[in-house]
Regions:
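N-terminal nicking endonuclease/strand-transfer module with a His-rich metal-binding environment
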Residues: 1-236
């Protein structure tokens, strides 16, 4: 999960749909100076139109007088990543992502983008679920909700420990029911340097460890980071 304070909602959309340099976060351009679309992605939206996500989020923010300050969290990015051995399709990944969003981000404007691969051809298909922090429609009260504002219309999404625990358990249960490989999301893991992991993948395509999760987090954080220091702050 990544909480984003940038008011430029279109930045996430552009990063998810167009090729970017993984180190700098800058878009790759063709000979005519145009951004290059990512290949093989699948995209969808909930409670909004994908192409007008940014404008619709700002409209909701203005309606409920939210997200006016620079320190306000504007959006949330949740990532579901799968083992290459699962051979899960983009459509199946989208189905799981939409179920997750419907359960844990109910009432929010959400865009979902499925990336068929990670860096260096690692093959780990993954879903980016980006939600406006302000809830456009009311949600049903769930067992992990601790306060009314966690499901009330016009209030902001709270990524609480209770919500994260329920979300992790849901993902593990879904993977288990579908016969997919999974990791214990409740087990502490040592995360080493991101680029060490990338070099390992370059030397050996089968190099897969727990650090793969960190690689996905960095991939999601890059469009929101303005500097390496800011990137470190987001990941922290």
């Amino acid at each position: 999960h990544i909480a984003n304070k940038s008011k430029i909602y279109s930045g996430a959309e552009q990063y998810l749909c167009f090729e970017h340099d993984a180190k700098t976060g800058k878009p790759f351009l063709d000979d005519q100076g145009r951004m290059i679309a990512r290949k093989g992605i699948l995209k969808d939206a909930i409670n909004c139109d994908f192409d007008s996500f940014a404008a619709e989020c700002m409209e909701t923010n203005n309606l409920y007088h939210k997200n006016k300050g620079t320190a306000d969290i504007k959006s949330h990015d949740y990532i579901l990543s799968f083992d290459p051995k699962d051979d899960i399709t983009a459509m199946e990944t989208m189905e799981l992502a939409k179920k997750y969003a419907g359960k844990f981000l109910e009432g929010h404007q959400v865009i979902i983008v499925i990336h068929p691969d990670g860096h260096n051809g690692s093959g780990n298909i993954h879903a980016h679920i980006v939600a406006n922090s302000v809830r456009k429609y009311p949600a049903l009260k769930q067992k992990w909700h601790e306060k009314v504002r966690e499901y009330k219309q016009g209030c902001k999404h709270k990524c609480t420990n209770a919500m994260l625990r329920s979300g992790k358990q849901w993902v593990m249960d879904e993977c288990r029911n579908r016969g997919l490989n999974q990791v214990d999301l409740f087990r502490s893991k040592v995360r080493e340097d991101y680029w060490v992991q990338k070099r390992g993948l370059e030397k050996d395509p089968d190099f897969m460890t727990d650090k793969d999760k960190l690689r996905i987090y960095v991939d999601a954080a890059l469009p929101f980071a303005t500097s390496m220091e800011h990137l470190a702050e987001i990941l922290h």
